[in-house]
């Protein structure tokens, strides 16, 4: 087997996160990412939230990457102000170009998630999609989310679990800090430990074809095996809409 793909550039945030490989950076521009991963997650999180944003809402995309989420977030939630945060300068350059292409006035922040350059209680909603499995300081990042969220604010959290990240195909094509990967329940417990509130109606466990690297769901599609229910399988993804109490 070949060695893992090499990272695309120097990591300006030091050891706080593990950046994408060249393949990963390309993949974040792909149709599969935009339509089968990002769009699906945003639609699911909107359902888990189950209510419109408050008037004049500020929405922060924490780990915005190349900005492919901006139009989807604007259409789904209609925030009054949309912000994007990323620690990678090249990604921010692409995010800026994407915002201009979409005609969206997105405020961009050059920062990692563990040290957000925003004031306390300044954001109504944080969207954090497929970012935490790159972060080394996960608890510190979550504490920053808590700090910048207003009381009653929401964190829309979508992550891949260790049962997806720790597979041969992902290890080959991508690069992650393996020692901090978590199960779905461990991610949810981390959110609880920070103080976020949520119920079963705010959580989903998507079992999407691309997250099952053993067969990519083909055996189920060909009806060679029966799909397993939640609780009978190793969850590969977890989505949650969690609230900072008033």
Where are these regions (language model features)?
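Conserved class I S-adenosyl-L-methionine
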Residues: 1-53, 72
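A C-terminal cap/extension of S-adenosyl-L-methionine-dependent methyltransferases
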Residues: 23-27, 102, 200-246
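Class I SAM-dependent methyltransferase SAM/SAH-binding core
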Residues: 66-114
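A short acidic, Gly/Pro-enriched loop at the edge of an enzyme's catalytic core
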Residues: 114-125
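A short glycine-rich, Lys/Arg-flanked "PGG" loop and its adjoining helix->strand segment in the class I
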Residues: 139-151
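Conserved beta-strand signature within the Rossmann-like core of class I S-adenosyl-L-methionine
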Residues: 153-159
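Short, glycine-/aromatic-enriched active-site segment of Class I SAM-dependent methyltransferases
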Residues: 161-177
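Short alpha-helix
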Residues: 180-195
